[in-house]
């Protein structure tokens, strides 16, 4: 049982990574002038979409929380709507936190918001898929001794790593790299 | 006894740090050796005949004089573009109209009409661009080094050979008027002098008008050979308004008129020199080495033609020190001994009508004299010290011998000289430039041994802090022996070192003495620590900092090693602080202290969750965290840009209100500032009232009630005066200036008296004696006259009964003198922190006054932020009742980080041009006269205000969790169902012990204070260690003098201020503790009586 779970975990993560790689290459087939550095905003949107889609598909296919009861269609719809609201809420609250952390308030608001969206994609979406719109369960998973299954364990690790990675990404900002994107930010 | 030993131990650790800092500084910030040799007329700089044309002429020294008189007009901070001609040859483009452009039109006219008489140069200034260093360079021709930058206030007489000295020894009459810095630099050198005070940068006109009063009469009287006029108006205008203010145009036009007037009065044997000593930044400051600061204007004019060619389109760039040898030779004087400038050869060519060959020869002879002088200087200097690099020196000597031989050969065989002359000139110039470059590089050379020693000492001190902070809370920490042995050994080492030096008759170096004492006291401590404690424990316990905190600390330290990060530190610090805050919140959640356990325990698993229930709900900690982030972000709006980042714009809110133009906005801002002041006051009073200390009848609380509002009133009134002083009608000027002198002094005096009161009677409690005392008060409204109704009877009869009861009880107690007298003392639970908060508020008000008005908002945020942080930290620190008490590392780190963040948000930057010099005038609008320590103190207090406040407030980190205990208890004791029980319970049990828990375990209390002090010193210490390491590793970095050295100096001074503040804060807690003890003793005695 456990080995099986670990195998499935591995495949899901590989798929996620693969989808990110795909999001770099596929759009260049359809879009002109697409590159990560030049049109980074578009890429962020696409990447976020890809990862969300992969997460959803995997959730539907793998169904790690098999114990959940069967429910009616209206239940599912309200659940889905709730998930959407949660996702938006997390985007906005991340945006607020970024601004509190020092992102400019008015300039570059779109960039900041897209950053919030991509971070939400890597943190909130897996939580929503795995735990559903259930804040108490989230709080449980992200506290000591709160993890009950290997899926939750993986969720904990990936989510915390996403936050730490986003945090680390802020560190090289002051370095004086003469990159075009940095010049743009400076302007 | 133990109190004293805690303080002494901390002082000893501070001494170790100071010794390390001093040793490192002495190796890092080397001063140039100042040679006292002098050039003289009789002694030519080198072998060989005296140069061409000087033989047989009277008054000629090394060279025949070309001008008998010089007028030197020094316009302080005359940037090059202020004097640059504005060409209007592009007709379509409208000329850029900035207040400082094109105002010196007489220069342009002269350059166009008399191209062979005048020349404009862009003179390249060596940093530091402070006036005194520039004056030194402009008279000695040398290179004042970095360390001199600090002594701008206390200028001293120049000991090196200089132009003024040469002039006076040649019997020339030097008349000076202007900036009184010259008085200190050249005491008694002038035949006639008119000095005007230079320090008051707000005064644009006194110096200039004073000069103008004397300039033309002196010139017409003819009793002078060299006339120096040093105008300050432009510089002061830059400091006060910046170059973009209309006032600058006025000032420059005035200077233009001065130049015009001088040109009209010049005689044929006189040279006019108009020079700026340095430039200014776009804010009007100077001191650093940005392009705008180091480019100054230099303009030469002679009524006779001296230049062989017309001026080039773009003015030539020359080093500023070139003026020194040029002027010396033009006036027929020896070049000052230590000069490293290169003569401006153009001026020696002899006018437009001279022969090309003879003019080139004249140039070569001037250059050769100059080269001989520089070579002699290098020879003497390298014999005196080992500063100069031997290899380069050797190369230069070879170059010089070759050039000199060529020159001699040229003199002897005039045939074919025309071809070789240019090469000789080029060789001589090459030598002079090489020598100058070598000197510039070598005078920034370091003593690596001292730097390594200082760094090692700093590292060792940090290690001691870490070790002792772990050891201090373990039982049986041997205070006295541990302290006495190292101190004794230190003294022994110092005496031995001094004796050794005495026997071999070397000069005693205080820095080395301190280092020896530090090392010899450090080693026995380490040995004792190892023997007594360390060997029993695994090494892992020595490094107790938790992982995430360690990571954040490492990032903080890594910041010091990159110039980009040091420049961006103002933004990186709030980011790190925010990370700390979120880390604290997340950690609280992770530890399960935020949520009720039923949410966390899985019913399926059935495990019992956390042993101690959460003390707060999750929303509470989250609110604190978000509030803190918001405060940090808001404080970040008061951001001053470092000069390196051109795209960044400093916050306009940092400037004083007086510089604002709009009346309405000014009034609004003034209102906001006063509101911030009132809010600060109200917050402190509210806090004191919440814990009840405000009710105490003790003098400090009376002061808080009445003195603090008075201080706020004084501050507000001073701001009103300062922001509107320029608009005051002339009749009120005297009154306004008087009031702006008295008010800040009154506020500072009030604060000092408040602190004195606090030290005198720090125990702010309200004592109510007698058990029945509260009940006697329950007698209700008095009733007079006979009762008329049943209701009246119902009311009166119990009253009478109660009254009689009281009477009897009172009589009984009086007869039974041994009866138990109970005393109810209130607010004992917050007695320590009440004293701390009062002291911090009293400290904050004078510091607030030293800043610009709108910084008061930052001070309000500072108090709010530290309040929230203390609450957040207290939520995570469990109160262990019997002790030992500890303050966790994250608390101390966050506190230190917040101090740094506040340093930046109060508008400071760790560079010298960013120092708020205005602070020196608060309370002293007329300047200080000759006093130097007071302005230095005021400016220092302004710069390191946040370091001081946070260091003094450091003990609050220990006290706060005990304060918060009352909240937790109150909340828990009022569940809805148990209200009846709570009422039944006697009042005494309900009262939480709070800070009295600390008093119950004094041993642990002192150990915790010591540990807190050591931890704070450790955090500050590793910062200074990182700065020292960065400065020593990157000592050849391009940015070392611009970024790393100033950063190190600011960190070092900040460390000293912080450590003193920390000692004061802990001493205050000790004083309160002593007072509480004596209060208890008195109470005990009273009870026994």
Curated annotation (Swiss-Prot), chain B:
Molecular function GO terms recorded? mannose-ethanolamine phosphotransferase activity
User: Pathway listed for it?
Assistant: Glycolipid biosynthesis; glycosylphosphatidylinositol-anchor biosynthesis
Glycosylated positions are 268
Q: Which GO terms describe its biological process?
A: GPI anchor biosynthetic process
GO CC list: endoplasmic reticulum membrane; membrane
Q: What is its EC number?
A: 2.-.-.-
What keywords are assigned to this protein?
Answer: Disease variant, Endoplasmic reticulum, Glycoprotein, GPI-anchor biosynthesis, Intellectual disability, Membrane, Transferase, Transmembrane, Transmembrane helix
Q: Which domain of life is it from?
A: Eukaryota
Q: Where are the transmembrane segments?
A: 4-24, 457-477, 482-502, 510-530, 541-561, 575-595, 668-688, 701-721, 747-767, 830-850, 857-877, 944-964, 1014-1034, 1048-1068
Q: What is the effect of changing residue 130 to N?
A: Found in a patient with epileptic encephalopathy; likely pathogenic; decrease in mannose-ethanolamine phosphotransferase activity; decreased protein expression
Q: What is the effect of changing residue 119 to W?
A: In HPMRS2; decrease in mannose-ethanolamine phosphotransferase activity
Task: Name the predominant localization.
Answer: endoplasmic reticulum
Membrane topology term reads: Multi-pass membrane protein
Q: What class of enzyme is it?
A: transferase
What is its subcellular localisation? Endoplasmic reticulum membrane
Q: Quote the function comment for this protein.
A: Catalytic subunit of the ethanolamine phosphate transferase 3 complex that transfers an ethanolamine phosphate (EtNP) from a phosphatidylethanolamine (PE) to the 6-OH position of the third alpha-1,2-linked mannose of an alpha-D-Man-(1->2)-alpha-D-Man-(1->6)-2-PEtn-alpha-D-Man-(1->4)-alpha-D-GlcN-(1->6)-(1-radyl,2-acyl-sn-glycero-3-phospho)-2-acyl-inositol (also termed H6) intermediate to generate a 6-PEtn-alpha-D-Man-(1->2)-alpha-D-Man-(1->6)-2-PEtn-alpha-D-Man-(1->4)-alpha-D-GlcN-(1->6)-(1-radyl,2-acyl-sn-glycero-3-phospho)-2-acyl-inositol (also termed H7) and participates in the tenth step of the glycosylphosphatidylinositol-anchor biosynthesis.
Question: What disease is this chain connected with?
Answer: Hyperphosphatasia with impaired intellectual development syndrome 2: An autosomal recessive form of intellectual disability characterized by facial dysmorphism, brachytelephalangy, and persistent elevated serum alkaline phosphatase (hyperphosphatasia). Some patients may have additional features, such as cardiac septal defects or seizures.
The protein's assembly and partners: Part of the ethanolamine phosphate transferase 3 complex composed by PIGO and PIGF. PIGF is required to stabilize PIGO.
Q: Which family does it belong to?
A: Belongs to the PIGG/PIGN/PIGO family. PIGO subfamily.
**Know the name of this protein?**
GPI ethanolamine phosphate transferase 3, catalytic subunit
Identify the species of origin.
Homo sapiens (Human)
The gene designation is PIGO
């Amino acid at each position: 049982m456990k080995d099986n779970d670990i195998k499935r975990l591995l495949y899901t993560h590989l798929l996620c990574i693969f989808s990110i790689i795909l999001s770099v290459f596929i759009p260049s087939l359809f879009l002109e002038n697409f590159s990560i550095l030049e049109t980074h905003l578009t890429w962020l949107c696409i990447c976020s979409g890809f990862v969300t889609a992969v997460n959803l598909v995997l959730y539907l296919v793998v169904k790690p929380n098999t114990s959940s009861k069967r429910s009616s269609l209206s239940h599912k719809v309200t659940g889905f709507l709730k998930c959407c609201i949660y996702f938006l809420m997390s985007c906005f609250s991340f945006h607020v936190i970024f601004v509190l952390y020092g992102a400019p308030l008015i300039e570059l608001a779109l960039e900041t918001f897209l950053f919030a969206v991509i971070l939400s994609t890597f943190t909130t979406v897996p939580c929503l898929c795995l735990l559903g719109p259930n804040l108490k369960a989230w709080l449980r998973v992200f506290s000591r001794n709160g993890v009950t299954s290997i899926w939750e364990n993986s969720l904990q690790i990936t989510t915390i790593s996403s936050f730490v990675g986003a945090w680390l990404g802020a560190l090289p900002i002051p370095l004086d790299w003469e990159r075009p994107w940095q010049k743009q930010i400076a302007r | 006894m133990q109190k004293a030993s805690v303080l002494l131990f901390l002082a000893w650790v501070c001494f170790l740090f100071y010794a390390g800092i001093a040793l490192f500084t002495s190796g890092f910030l080397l001063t140039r050796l100042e040679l006292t040799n002098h050039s003289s007329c009789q002694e030519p700089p080198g072998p060989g005949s005296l140069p061409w044309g000087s033989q047989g002429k009277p008054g000629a020294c090394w060279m025949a004089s070309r001008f008998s008189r010089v007028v030197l007009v020094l316009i302080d901070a005359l940037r090059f573009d202020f004097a640059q001609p504005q060409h209007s040859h592009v007709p379509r483009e409208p000329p850029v109209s900035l207040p400082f452009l094109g105002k010196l039109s007489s220069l342009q006219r002269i350059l166009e009409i008399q191209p062979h008489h005048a020349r404009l140069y862009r003179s390249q200034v060596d940093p530091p661009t402070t006036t005194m260093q520039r004056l030194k360079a402009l008279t000695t021709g040398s290179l004042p080094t970095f360390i001199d930058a600090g002594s701008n206030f206390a200028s001293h007489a120049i000991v090196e050979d200089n132009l003024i000295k040469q002039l006076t020894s040649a019997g020339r009459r030097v008349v000076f008027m202007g900036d009184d810095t010259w008085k200190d630099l050249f005491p008694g050198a002038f035949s006639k002098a008119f000095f005007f005070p230079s320090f008051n940068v707000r005064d644009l006109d006194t110096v200039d008008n004073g000069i103008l009063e004397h300039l033309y009469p002196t010139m017409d009287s003819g009793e002078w050979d060299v006339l120096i006029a040093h105008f300050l108006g432009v510089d002061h205008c830059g400091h006060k308004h910046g170059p973009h203010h209309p006032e600058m145009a006025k000032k420059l036009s005035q200077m233009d008129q001065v130049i015009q007037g001088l040109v009209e009065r010049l005689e044929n044997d006189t040279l006019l020199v108009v020079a700026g000593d340095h430039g200014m930044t776009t804010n009007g400051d100077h001191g650093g080495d940005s392009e705008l600061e180091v480019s100054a204007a230099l303009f030469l004019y002679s009524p006779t033609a001296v230049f062989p060619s017309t001026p080039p389109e773009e003015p030539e760039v020359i080093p500023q020190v070139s003026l020194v040898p040029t002027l010396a030779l033009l006036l027929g004087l020896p070049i000052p001994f230590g000069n490293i400038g290169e003569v401006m050869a153009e001026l020696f060519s002899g006018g437009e009508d001279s022969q090309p060959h003879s003019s080139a020869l004249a140039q070569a002879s001037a250059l050769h004299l100059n080269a001989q002088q520089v070579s002699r200087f290098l020879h003497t200097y390298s014999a005196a010290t080992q500063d100069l690099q031997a290899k380069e020196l050797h190369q230069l000597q070879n170059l010089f011998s070759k050039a000199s031989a060529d020159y001699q050969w040229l003199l002897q065989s005039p045939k074919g000289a025309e071809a070789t002359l240019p090469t000789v000139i080029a060789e001589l110039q090459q030598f002079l430039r090489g020598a100058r470059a070598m000197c510039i590089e070598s005078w920034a050379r370091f003593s690596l041994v001292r730097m390594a020693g200082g760094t090692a000492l700093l590292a060792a001190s940090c290690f001691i802090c870490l070790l002792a902070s772990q050891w201090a809370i373990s039982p049986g920490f041997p205070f006295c022996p541990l302290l006495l042995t190292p101190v004794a050994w230190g003294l022994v080492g110092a005496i031995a070192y001094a004796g050794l030096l005495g026997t071999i008759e070397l000069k005693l170096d205080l820095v080395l003495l301190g280092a020896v004492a530090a090392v010899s006291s450090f080693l026995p401590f380490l040995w004792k620590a190892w023997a007594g404690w360390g060997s029993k424990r695994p090494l892992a316990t020595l490094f107790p900092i938790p992982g995430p905190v360690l990571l954040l600390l490492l990032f903080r330290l890594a910041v010091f090693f990159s110039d980009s990060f040091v420049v961006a530190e103002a933004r990186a610090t709030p980011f790190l602080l925010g990370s700390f805050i979120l880390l604290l919140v997340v950690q609280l959640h992770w530890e399960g202290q935020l949520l009720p356990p039923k949410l966390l325990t899985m019913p399926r698993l059935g495990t019992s969750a956390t042993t101690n229930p959460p003390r707060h709900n999750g929303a509470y900690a989250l609110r604190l965290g978000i509030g803190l982030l918001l405060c940090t972000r808001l404080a970040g709006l008061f951001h001053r840009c470092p000069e390196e980042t051109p795209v960044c714009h400093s916050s306009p809110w940092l400037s004083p209100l007086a510089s604002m133009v709009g009346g309405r906005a000014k009034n609004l801002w003034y209102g906001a500032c006063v509101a911030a002041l009132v809010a600060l006051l109200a917050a402190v009073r509210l806090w004191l009232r919440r814990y009840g200390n405000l009710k105490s009848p003790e003098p400090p609380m009376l002061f808080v009630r009445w003195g603090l509002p008075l201080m706020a009133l004084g501050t507000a009134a001073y701001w009103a005066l300062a922001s509107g002083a320029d608009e005051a009608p002339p009749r009120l000027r005297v009154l306004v200036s008087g009031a702006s002198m008295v008010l800040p002094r009154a506020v500072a005096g009030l604060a000092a008296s408040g602190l004195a009161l606090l030290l005198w009677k720090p125990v702010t409690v309200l004592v109510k004696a007698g058990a029945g005392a509260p009940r006697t008060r329950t007698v209700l409204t008095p009733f007079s006259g006979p009762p008329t109704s049943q209701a009246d009877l119902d009311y009166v009869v119990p009253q009478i009964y109660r009254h009689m009861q009281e009477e009897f009880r009172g009589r009984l107690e009086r007869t039974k003198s041994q009866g138990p007298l109970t005393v109810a003392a209130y607010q004992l639970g917050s007695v320590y922190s009440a004293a701390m908060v009062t002291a911090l508020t009293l400290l904050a008000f004078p510091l607030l006054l030293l800043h610009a008005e709108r910084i008061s908002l930052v001070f309000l945020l500072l108090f709010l932020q530290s309040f929230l942080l203390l609450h957040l930290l207290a939520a995570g620190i469990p109160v262990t009742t019997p002790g030992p008490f500890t303050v966790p590392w994250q608390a101390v780190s966050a506190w230190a980080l917040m101090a740094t963040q506040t340093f930046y948000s109060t508008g400071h930057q760790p560079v010298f041009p960013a120092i708020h010099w205005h602070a020196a005038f608060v309370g002293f609008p007329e300047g200080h006269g000759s006093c130097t320590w007071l302005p230095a103190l005021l400016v220092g207090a302004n710069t390191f205000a946040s370091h001081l406040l946070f260091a003094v407030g450091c003990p609050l980190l220990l006290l706060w969790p005990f304060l918060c205990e009352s909240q937790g208890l109150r909340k828990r004791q009022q569940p809805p169902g148990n209200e009846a029980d709570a009422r039944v319970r006697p009042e005494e049990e309900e009262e939480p012990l709070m800070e009295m828990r600390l008093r119950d375990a004094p041993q642990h209390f002192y150990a915790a204070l010591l540990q807190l002090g050591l931890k704070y010193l450790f955090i500050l210490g590793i910062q200074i260690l990182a700065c020292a390491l960065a400065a020593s590793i990157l000592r050849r970095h391009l940015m070392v003098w611009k970024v790393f050295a100033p950063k190190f100096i600011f960190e070092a001074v900040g460390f000293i201020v912080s450590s003193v503040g920390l000692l004061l804060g802990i001493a205050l807690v000790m004083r309160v503790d002593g007072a509480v003890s004596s209060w208890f003793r008195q109470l005990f005695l009273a009870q026994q009586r």
